[in-house]
Amino acid sequence: YGQNKQVLSIGRVQTPTLALIVNRQLEIANFVPKQYWELKTVYRDTTFSAIIRKSEEELILEAEKNKEAIAAGKKPKKEEENRGIDPIASQEQGAALLEQIRNSPFAITNVTKKEGKEAPPRLFDLTSLQVECNKKFAYSADETLKIIQSLYEKKVATYPRVDTTYLSDDIYPKCPGILKGLRDYATFTTPLDGTTLLKSKKVFDNSKVTDHHAIIPTGQYPQNLTDMERRVFDLIARRFIAVFYPDCKFATTTVLGVVEEIEFKTTGKQILEPGWRVIFGTPGAQSQEEKDPGEEENVLPAFVKGESGPHVPDLYEKWTQPPRPYTEATLLRAMETAGKLVDNDELRDALKENGIGRPSTRAAIIETLFKRNYIRKEKKNLIATSTGVELIQIIHEELLKSAELTGIWEKKLREIEKKTYNAAQFLEELKQMVSEVVMSVLSDNSNRHITIVQAVQEATADGKNGKAAKEKDASKPKRQSKPRKKATEAKPVTPVDGASQTGNIQTDATQTDSVEGQVCPLCGKGTIIKGKTAYGCSEWKNGCTFRQAFGSE
């Protein structure tokens, strides 16, 4: 499908990963924004939002999430009464509601306050460290891997290529010594001196550790670190110290109000005891991967049930938003939790532990997609090039580009480990699948070709990533840059003879495939089929070696 004998690589890890990016890109391209309105009012300098009744779709989604939580052994979310007004789909509907409540008093109907605890963030495995570094410092997964590998070689951090966030019990007695070695963090480690360190099951669990434990400092004083290394070491050190601090205690307040039978709601959060949050500075500056928008501290005034008074209502125009493009951080998470991309429960379970790829190989997979010019970077966003998009669209075998194939193989490999599945049978199945895929490609007579994207890579003055590469048609070379470090200039691609401006082969209408469909002259059983570069026999997988170059008939 390539041009000028260009090799287009696929693989059970790189192709599903590319498909994630392409499918997200197509979702964004095909997204049609919908207009809606929000009714809000301000009472005592606090903004309340009208409660909107959930749609049938939202209720089904919540039920599915609860099922997944139960299956994972977690407590499902408590079902709430589905009340409130219907979604405001038109400005006229919103204006009528606004007039209905404008001159009536706002009354507080309920005030609830709940206290809760928040445990420290988990220690780092390789993927979570790569995610955090991409979010905080815009480091690529490959850059982070090289940095943490360097820290390991300098003996200031433990083995990096790990997929667990836990420590084994035998590490616990060593922790006081490690903390003592973190001299630059004495402000945080001194309060722990002479105390019995917390030993949480969320940190120390032998059953969650195999060959290596989570990434932590070794206790050796870091010297001669680069700025990038120091930043990454700081993340690791603070995470490690935080797990020995008490939970953060907070209070969540929910206040309900009503105007003319239309219910309103607001929530607030107050930090009671910061606990481990002091390690990360301000309460909102903790280093957690996924933070809810309403997680910042928001202290509400003291409301009393039954109070009422004037308010200022307003109507706000809103538009539904498309999904966000993948960044390296969100792509790594998607690769890790690929179980969400398949419907089969057994396959999902197999993927929970392994995802797409392994922690130690995911950075290399993303780099491969860059090197193949399947993706490029625009700021932090990963964008599929025309080559990447067309490659995914041209692959007919869904298994090759879905997380399901990885799940099937991982599941069977686990069964082989347990001696409940035959390894020889697994190999035969792989051979059969490969034969079928190859036959499918050989019998594809569509003459479709993929636009080969070339890029000129430039390095900026400080040696960091340059501008994002732009695509260029095979017959229209354009000089542009791509965010890789090495400065290399790509040669323009010359279209193959007969190629159109779009890269598709133009065939003469008078040409006919005179041999295609005839009985194979070598084995006498199969029929001649048209391959990519020559004619072959349909019985090739059974050993027939017939081959005839194009134009020699």
Where in the sequence are the language-model features?
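C-terminal or mid-to-C-terminal helical accessory/interaction module adjacent to the motor/catalytic core
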Residues: 1-43, 114-117
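Basic, low-complexity terminal or inter-domain segments flanking catalytic cores
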Residues: 30, 74-81, 94, 112, ...
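Beta-strand/loop nucleic-acid-binding surfaces
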Residues: 50-53
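Metal- or metallocofactor-binding catalytic centers and their adjacent structured scaffolds
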Residues: 69-71, 76-122, 130
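A conserved hydrophobic secondary-structure block that centers on an alpha-helix together
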Residues: 136-140
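Eukaryotic nuclear/nucleolar intrinsically disordered, charge-dense low-complexity regions
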Residues: 154-157
